[in-house]
Amino acid sequence: MMKKFGKTNVLAFLAVMSFGLLASCSQDNDNNPDKWAQDAIAMAEDSVEKVDNEMVGKLLYIDNCRQFARKAIDDKISDTYKEMEEKVKDKSDEEKWELFKGFRTDIDSAFSKMDQHYDQVSQEEEKKLIGKSLKVASDTQSFDNTKTKAEIVDFSHRSKVKIKVTLTPTKPLGNSFRMILVDKDQKPIAPFALMTMPKKAGETLTVETNGPIALLAQTSMLLFDAR
């Protein structure tokens, strides 16, 4: 694991900040904002457990690493800020403003570098899942279960997946129906209300909906209940 930030490094960072030289630090300097992000990412990868799920386990692991790394950076910022307040207490308001303005910029840079890393690795995994089919079943009193299918079509946001559902009603369908995520024992996890145009019996229905990736990791089937 990469070296964690120690008290000596924090004090060195404050000293550099005091002279306004942080921007000129080399890339391999422990006080560089890029290094903050790199260390947080390494700490996350060493600390976060893998997620045992064939379809979305890697994406959930990446998201958990992102949250861990964000907290690692946030905790270090909090500690550093407290030491900075003590260090600059005798400086003028103008000097304090300039110092903390630079500190804010470096905070944003560290978070940005970290997010860029996880966005990139997430997108690589998302591409592999586009078009994947989900295990699905439908209400046989309302739909032809042999023609029911669901697949992943896109990832609209971090930890969000877009699903395309195809159903064929066996009787006239109104303008809405329910989709229920269930676990492997068919116990309900979460319902979604889907709106659609009324359909005739035998008329194919296609609906897209967004849902959290975390729910898919627990789901073995999707049930559709007309109403």
Where does each model-flagged region fall?
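Transition segment at domain starts
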Residues: 97-104, 108-158
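Beta-strand signatures of extracellular beta-sandwich domains
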Residues: 178-182
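A short beta-turn/strand-edge loop motif at beta-sheet boundaries
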Residues: 169-175, 215
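C-terminal motif of bacterial Sec signal peptides marking the signal peptidase cleavage site
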Residues: 21-24
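Short, solvent-exposed, Trp/other aromatic-anchored flexible loops in extracytoplasmic proteins
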Residues: 187-227
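Bacterial N-terminal signal peptides that target proteins for export
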Residues: 2-12
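Post-signal-peptide N-terminal segment of Sec-exported extracytoplasmic proteins
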Residues: 45-91, 98
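Bacterial signal peptide processing site
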Residues: 26-28
